[in-house]
Swiss-Prot record:
Keywords: Amino-acid biosynthesis, Cytoplasm, NADP, Oxidoreductase, Proline biosynthesis
Entry superkingdom: Bacteria
PANTHER family (alphabetical): DELTA-1-PYRROLINE-5-CARBOXYLATE SYNTHASE (PTHR11063:SF8), GLUTAMATE SEMIALDEHYDE DEHYDROGENASE (PTHR11063)
This protein's name: Gamma-glutamyl phosphate reductase
PROSITE patterns from the UniProt entry: PROA
EC number(s) stated in the UniProt entry for this protein: 1.2.1.41
Naturally occurring in which organism (per UniProt): Lactococcus lactis subsp. lactis (strain IL1403)
InterPro entries per record: Ald_DH/histidinol_DH (IPR016161), Ald_DH_C (IPR016163), Ald_DH_N (IPR016162), Aldehyde_DH_dom (IPR015590), G-glutamylP_reductase_CS (IPR020593), Glu-5-SA_DH (IPR012134), GPR_dom (IPR000965)
């Protein structure tokens, strides 16, 4: 199956790369309309996935990741329209000059070619990934999780119907419908078809892709995000930030998983936070010895807890004596995604931003803002936690490479 699908997307990438900006934008606008028109059809297929998940004892949080409704489909359509309105990076000139030999040298943005995307649960990723790849002149091979197979299949069917109506090759998107681990591994090693592979999901998925892939990988999204409440923090502000970062949507990668608190304010802050956050949703605190003494409920934290992306109503808590200890702790356990400090001390804020090794480092704000739309990129294909090629929310430019174009008049060397 991978051979067949790989050949299709590889061949299609040449055609998609030739499309004009206008043609791509019109297509994305029409696809947005088509999603709205097919809302009932999409929800019907999504309900099959939800029914299967219910049989397997799906959690409240996983149900949220999987569920599609009219509002979420409308949001997907809005995302398509926003991508259509973004500037097209393809053929953008990055630099141009004439060198000492009289050669005219231009550097332009070009598509990566064929993109592989392996993801879990969220069917909206199907639309996000396609729209960004299509806008940047790439074809895409998708492999979603078995829990969202019906949702992913109907979304790809709708995309293909629109491609054929627009007389564009429907190989611009393909879905690996065989969700077995064996086929996934074949995809990870399909380097003769795929130019890059982007995993988006749990730490287990991302680590498996890193271990097995021969296709170049852009690592995304494990979000063990931490908030440090400094001794000078406004405790009302800190409480609101932690509650938002932990409870608004705990199943996403920019939710807070860990809390670090300066020991000088722990006795006052932690009981206040515990009281307020449990009004929103009951939280399981996994805390160190000092924190457990002032929390009314909690269990002792292990070292693993400080490095875990829970994706649940669980929060690890660490108390520290100073900023250096906080930075050391975060850099030890962080997934390099998003970290935040709540402080009124300008020096501490600057030191934290300078020394924390992460894609996004906040002062006095929730980690929930790490997002392509918020950062002005439009939709995102993922949030890269590595340092090569792309880091942070990955928008259109992250799905491009560059090419040098050199014009001469007979020069030799």
């Amino acid at each position: 199956m991978i051979e067949e699908l790989g050949l299709k997307v590889k061949k299609a990438s040449k055609e998609v790369a030739k499309l004009s900006t206008a043609d791509k934008n019109v297509f994305l606008q029409n696809l947005a309309d088509s999603l709205i028109e097919n809302t009932d059809r999409i929800i019907s297929e999504n309900e099959k996935d939800l029914a299967n998940a219910l049989e397997h004892g799906i959690s409240e949080i996983m149900d949220d990741r999987l569920r599609l409704n009219a509002q979420r489909i409308s949001d997907m359509a809005t995302g398509l329209r926003q991508v259509a309105e973004l500037p097209d990076p393809i053929r953008q000139v990055l630099q141009g000059f004439t060198n000492l030999d009289g050669l005219k040298i231009l550097q332009k943005r070009v598509p990566l070619g064929t993109v592989g995307m392996i993801f879990e649960s969220r069917p909206n990723v199907t639309i996000d990934a396609f729209s960004l790849c299509f806008k940047t002149g790439n074809s895409v091979l998708l492999r979603g999780g078995s829990d969202a197979i019906y949702s992913n299949m109907v979304l790809v069917e709708i995309i293909k119907e629109n491609l054929l109506s627009a007389k564009i090759t429907d190989g611009a998107v393909e879905l690996l419908s065989d969700t077995s681990h064996a086929e996934a591994e074949k995809m990870m090693q399909a380097d003769k078809f795929l130019d890059v592979l982007i995993p988006r999901g749990s730490a287990r998925l991302i680590n498996r892709v890193k271990e097995k892939a021969t296709v170049p990988v852009i690592e995304t999204g494990v979000g063990n995000c931490t908030i440090f409440v400094d001794e000078s923090a406004d405790l009302e502000m800190a409480t609101k930030i932690v509650i938002n970062a932990k409870t608004q949507r705990p199943s996403v990668c920019n939710a807070a998983e860990s809390l670090v608190v300066h020991a000088k304010i722990a006795d006052e802050f932690l009981p206040k936070l515990e009281n307020e956050i449990n009004k929103v949703h009951e939280i399981e605190f996994r805390a160190d010895e000092r924190a457990l003494k002032v929390l009314s409920a909690g269990i002792p934290a292990t070292d693993d807890d400080f490095g875990t992306e829970f994706l649940d109503y669980i929060l690890s808590v660490k108390t520290v004596d100073n900023l250096d200890e906080a930075i050391e702790h975060i850099n030890t356990y962080s997934s390099r995604h998003s970290e935040s400090i709540v402080t009124h001390d300008y020096f501490n804020a600057q030191k934290f931003q300078d020394e924390i090794d992460a894609a996004a480092v906040y002062v006095n704000a929730s980690t929930r803002f790490t997002d392509g739309f918020v950062f002005g990129l439009g939709a995102e294909i993922g949030i890269s936690t590595q340092k090569l090629h792309a880091r942070g929310p990955m928008g259109l430019e992250a799905l491009t490479s560059t090419k040098y174009l050199i014009d001469g008049t007979g020069q030799i060397r």
